[in-house]
Amino acid sequence: MTIEIGQKAPDLELKGDHGETVKLSDYKGKYIVLYFYPKDMTPGCTTEACDFRDSHESFAELDAVIIGVSPDSQEKHGKFKEKHNLPFLLLVDDEHKLAEAFDVWKLKKNFGKEYMGIERSTFLIDKEGRLIKEWRKVKVKDHVAEALQTLKDMSEK
């Protein structure tokens, strides 16, 4: 079953990039910008992560935390964060539990080869833990700016 707008976000336990156990409910009282990306250190994923990094303060001013999610290991996340000075949490979803709950673990095709992987997507979760906005099949260019503007518009209401 896939989460839909207005529903509570799944509260699964995952490992953070420092080995800590993390649940989305740990951030109740804040907006969560939850973004799923395919793989650390790849061009599109690096661009997206750096765009979120560069807008991190603007999101924080709106009482939002940014959380990235991929199947990569804690060690790979650590190297990725260090190399690109990422100031936000990266979650290890090596069993694809959170990706499946948000329906972003998909059959993909590249150069004629089929495989399972993350469909780049972002979800905005409100301060009570409910999904309020989703962006699926994200194109990296201008995505972070759009997500930030959406949050600004919502917080002005």
Curated annotation (Swiss-Prot):
Residues 3-156 form the Thioredoxin domain. The active site is at C45. Keywords: Antioxidant, Disulfide bond, Oxidoreductase, Peroxidase, Redox-active center. Its EC number is 1.11.1.24. GO terms for biological process: cell redox homeostasis; cellular response to oxidative stress. It holds the Pfam family AhpC-TSA. It catalyses: a hydroperoxide + [thioredoxin]-dithiol = an alcohol + [thioredoxin]-disulfide + H2O. Disulfide bonds join C45-C50. The keyword tRNA-binding does not apply. GO terms for cellular component: cytoplasm. InterPro entries: AhpC/TSA, Peroxiredoxin_AhpC-typ, Peroxiredoxin_BCP/PrxQ, Thioredoxin-like_sf, Thioredoxin_domain. The active site is a conserved redox-active cysteine residue, the peroxidatic cysteine (C(P)), which makes the nucleophilic attack on the peroxide substrate. The peroxide oxidizes the C(P)-SH to cysteine sulfenic acid (C(P)-SOH), which then reacts with another cysteine residue, the resolving cysteine (C(R)), to form a disulfide bridge. The disulfide is subsequently reduced by an appropriate electron donor to complete the catalytic cycle. In this atypical 2-Cys peroxiredoxin, C(R) is present in the same subunit to form an intramolecular disulfide. Belongs to the peroxiredoxin family. BCP/PrxQ subfamily. Thiol-specific peroxidase that catalyzes the reduction of hydrogen peroxide and organic hydroperoxides to water and alcohols, respectively. Plays a role in cell protection against oxidative stress by detoxifying peroxides and as sensor of hydrogen peroxide-mediated signaling events. NCBIfam families: PRK09437.1. This is Peroxiredoxin Bcp. The gene is ygaF.
